[in-house]
A protein has these predicted regions:
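An alpha-helical repeat/solenoid feature that recognizes helix-turn-helix modules
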Residues: 1-31, 42-87, 99-100, 104-133
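A general marker of short, structured functional hotspots
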Residues: 31-32, 158
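Compact integral membrane and secretory-pathway proteins
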Residues: 37-41
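Terminal, non-catalytic domain-edge segments
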Residues: 93, 109-161
Length: 163
């Protein structure tokens, strides 16, 4: 959350939360989740930024990636913790932007089918966070003497063995 220096934005924060969660950085997630609670709209969704030149109405893109961040943080975006005083959840806010065609609108005020909004809404409604790949790194291999180094040992920190 960069709100101390800028207005912050929900999208960048969502990707940071998901990356931190994938890397096991759960202690760093609380400020971002508090940021989301502080700017959540009464309908349950989020705008890109508050304040914003785009307005502060809920948009599908920002709501979708925020839902993914909540999921990555191990919370339920349809649960009581994310239900507004008006009784709305992030999931309901996103579902409300789905058109009869099955596609999603960016905002209620711009109801046309929006490809990016649709692409971002689908994994969020499927309950999936952004799919970060992880890799297990094994123990470092024993250092080896390499003739080209004049007999010097290779730095053990560079001698990684991937499994």
């Amino acid at each position: 959350d960069a709100s101390a220096e800028t207005a912050g934005d929900t999208n960048s924060t969502a990707y940071a939360v998901q990356a931190l969660a994938a890397a096991g950085g759960s202690d760093a997630l609380a400020p971002a989740l508090a940021y989301y609670k502080g700017i959540q709209n009464d309908d349950g969704g989020w705008p890109y930024q508050t304040p914003s030149e785009y307005g502060t109405a809920t948009d599908a893109n920002s709501t979708a990636v925020t839902i993914q961040a909540i999921i990555a943080a191990g919370q339920d975006p349809a649960g009581a913790d994310w239900t507004t005083g008006a009784g709305n959840t992030p999931v309901a806010a996103l579902e409300a932007l789905q058109n009869e065609s099955g596609a999603f609108a960016w905002q209620a005020a711009m109801p046309d089918d929006n490809l990016l909004a649709t692409i971002q809404a689908l994994p969020a409604l499927a309950g999936e966070a952004f799919p970060f790949a992880t890799m297990a790194v094994g123990e470092p291999a024993a250092p080896a003497t390499v003739p080209q180094t004049g007999g010097a040992l290779v730095n053990p920190a560079l001698a990684l063995r991937y499994e």
